[in-house]
């Protein structure tokens, strides 16, 4: 059989032309290249489209090492990254009910099960007690992938419990907000959480304890209209979208075209809505420093 040898490989006449070497050009072995590239899962940056391994992006706090884009961080990952040491998780005893027997394209309990399977979490808010740089504090984080981080009764229960524990322990409360708003499947019960969380925050403030909100991408609706805008200090991550109604809804209502950076963190900083924009890598130290100043700690 007529065969030719190229680069140590035996090629037969049936070898596709795409696999035949071009004279004068060195080509890496295809299998070695694939093995090197796909030894672990990768994440594509939505901004620069660079492929980054999950290990690398996790080590970098979910900030793209190529373009510095802040990728969305899961709530549990964020709290574990934020705290030096986690003491306890709060509010795990609360579970969602379906008092309205709500059905849209599918029953509410089915949506809940899908969200739990997708995220591995039982609800859209995780609350933990831990310490950062030697200071004990309470922190909450929204899981946006759980029904768009929508606020229902369990989210309200967990937030209120976190605020009450902060008061009891004389510790500051930190909230990482990321939500599409109130959960429509719970109707008025969901809207009531705006009042409940706001009242809990006021009790916290009455005791002189700080409440710091970190606005991550995105924050909208009833969460913006309540707990996300009641902080003593509001920090935003770069390029986070923050608002009540979305840009498209507003444009359709007022029949005007809004300027491009509308509702971006940078635009809101220029207009006095947020106090500062902080890179995620500097966030732990920034919160720690603010807490120390607000609580007159050494």
Swiss-Prot record:
Keywords: ATP-binding, Cytoplasm, Fatty acid biosynthesis, Fatty acid metabolism, Lipid biosynthesis, Lipid metabolism, Metal-binding, Nucleotide-binding, Transferase, Zinc, Zinc-finger. GO terms for molecular function: acetyl-CoA carboxylase activity; ATP binding; carboxyl- or carbamoyltransferase activity; zinc ion binding. Pfam families: Carboxyl_trans. Binds 1 zinc ion per subunit. One of its GO terms (cellular component) is acetate CoA-transferase complex. One of its GO terms (biological process) is malonyl-CoA biosynthetic process. This is Acetyl-coenzyme A carboxylase carboxyl transferase subunit beta. It comes from Acinetobacter baumannii (strain SDF).
